[in-house]
Amino acid sequence: MPAPVSRAHTSALVLFSGGQDSTTCLAQALAKYERVETIAFDYGQRHKVELQARLNVLRELKSQFPQWAAKLGEDHLLDLAVLGQVSDCSLTRDVAFKMESSGLPNTFVPGRNLLFLTLAAALAYRRDLQVLVTGVCETDFSGYPDCRDDTMKAMQLALSLGMDKRFLIETPLMWIDKADTWALAESLGGQPLVELIIEHTHTCYLGDRIHRHAWGYGCGQCPACELRARGYARYAEAA
């Protein structure tokens, strides 16, 4: 069995795509841990603009939040083109968004989060990081099976056993909706963090950085934009 994990974690590896959710998770990790590293994956996604967005977010976080800048460690970008080769979905192919006969939207990339966590754990093993932070949730999501709490618990056990190292997978957004995610960001970094998320993070499946809305950039019509817009509207109404 893996060796017992220390109760006092001091470092974490955040799966950071450059979107609203992972940026909020990164902010929480920076508020909680002494050392934080980030990891992302280039898997042949259509909206590669997110790979640039994440660099912009990291730059702005360091500039606007000096108390967090000192905690930000190395950023890692891994080439996972093989995932795009085996996936036939609207995130890796130029096809329209639709629901499949399985009941899942064709934005689902089979195995994506499982691969992400496995590779993140392998890197964390080498970097001596015991906490993996991911922005998956069961509340405002499209039914993706690899976003479920049960899946995360199973992955935590499998990775800990398979690498003989006691990993902890943190899912700060698992039980909150998009409106609460906006509110969480405000509680962590005030209005400056909310504005940073609006201006610099990317969510749109189509990679639209032309159309600016109150909640940020995007086409306003894809499932990701609609979810982000509804959450922001509820957050703004409650503010």
Curated annotation (Swiss-Prot):
Pathway: Purine metabolism; 7-cyano-7-deazaguanine biosynthesis. It catalyses: 7-carboxy-7-deazaguanine + NH4(+) + ATP = 7-cyano-7-deazaguanine + ADP + phosphate + H2O + H(+). It is an enzyme of class 6 (ligase). The keyword Nucleotide-binding applies. SUPFAM superfamilies: Adenine nucleotide alpha hydrolases-like (SSF52402). Zn(2+) binds at residues 204, 219, 222, 225. Binds 1 zinc ion per subunit. Its cofactor is Zn(2+). Keywords: ATP-binding, Ligase, Metal-binding, Nucleotide-binding, Queuosine biosynthesis, Zinc. One of its GO terms (molecular function) is ligase activity, forming carbon-nitrogen bonds. Coiled coil: none annotated. ATP binds at residues 16-26. GO terms for biological process: queuosine biosynthetic process. The keyword Glycosyltransferase does not apply. Its EC number is 6.3.4.20. Belongs to the QueC family. Catalyzes the ATP-dependent conversion of 7-carboxy-7-deazaguanine (CDG) to 7-cyano-7-deazaguanine (preQ(0)). This is 7-cyano-7-deazaguanine synthase. The lineage of its organism: Bacteria, Pseudomonadati, Pseudomonadota, Betaproteobacteria, Burkholderiales. The gene is queC.
